[in-house]
């Protein structure tokens, strides 16, 4: 069973001492290629491409200008401890022990516009590149053209080990639509379960983005800390008042509600 997750825009490269365990991104050469494309852009071109403020443009222009420098490589940090946002707050990886981190390394994947797909302990450098950015490259007009085949092939390879413990590989989709769209699901040949989190309001259930992001992190944490490989055990998730709503769930779109 593999969990897929979205990255965050905010990165924290302050040193941490959670673990000495680390790994190299499987698509590190592809990341270098994309970084070289971004290195060649002027600040104005970079800001327009990413639709970001002048302050963020300045920061990210400097990041890609320094991409290949020794000090940049030395400043690399494990992905799971670097990304910061609502989903990663729910995940709270800083409290994981080494056993939990090793389980995460086997079952948890972060999709990335720059790195394609990351294991939690993969070392990453300072960057910003969202999957929806229309960066022209050798394979097409945008990052979906560049990554879809590569990410799908890699996930398919990693999911094959599921066959030993279940009749069909299982993908738990806890990523946003922007990142989930980087996968060719028809070629994956896997059962895809998508947990959806809703709040009760005015007589019905609605998705509140900030809460849904946090809940995706909490669900991932629940899977990792309990070493879950049987998807039916996800229905036991009850963090912060959520519960599995069988009545409103449809197929493999599993609804968790609260309120």
Question: Could you say what each language-model-derived stretch is?
Answer:
Residues 4-95:
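Active-site helix-to-loop segments that bind/position phosphate- or nucleotide-bearing substrates
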Residues 93-250, 255-259:
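Internal, well-folded beta-alpha domain core
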């Amino acid at each position: 069973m593999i969990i897929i997750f979205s990255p965050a825009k905010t990165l924290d490269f302050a040193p941490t001492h959670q673990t000495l365990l680390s790994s190299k991104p499987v698509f590190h050469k592809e990341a270098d290629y994309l970084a070289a494309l971004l290195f060649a852009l002027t600040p104005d071109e970079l800001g327009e491409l990413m639709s970001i403020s002048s302050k963020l443009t300045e920061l990210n222009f400097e990041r890609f200008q320094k991409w290949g420098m020794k000090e940049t490589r030395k400043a690399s940090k494990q992905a799971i401890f670097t990304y910061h946002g609502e989903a990663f707050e729910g995940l709270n990886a800083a409290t994981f022990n080494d056993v939990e981190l090793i389980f995460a390394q086997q079952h948890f994947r972060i999709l990335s516009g720059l790195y394609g797909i990351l294991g939690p302990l993969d070392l990453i450098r300072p960057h910003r590149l969202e999957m929806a950015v229309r960066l022209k490259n050798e394979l097409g007009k945008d990052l979906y053209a560049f990554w879809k085949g590569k990410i799908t092939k890699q996930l398919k390879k990693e999911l094959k080990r599921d066959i030993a413990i279940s009749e069909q590989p299982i993908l738990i989709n806890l990523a946003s639509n922007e990142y989930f769209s980087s996968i060719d699901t028809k070629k994956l040949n896997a059962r895809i379960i998508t947990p959806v989190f809703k709040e009760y309001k005015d007589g019905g259930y609605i998705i509140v983005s900030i809460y849904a992001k946090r809940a995706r992190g909490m669900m991932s944490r629940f899977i990792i800390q309990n070493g879950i490989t049987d998807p039916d055990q996800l229905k036991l998730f009850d963090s912060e008042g959520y519960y599995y709503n069988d009545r409103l769930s449809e197929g493999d779109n599993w609804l968790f509600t609260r309120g």
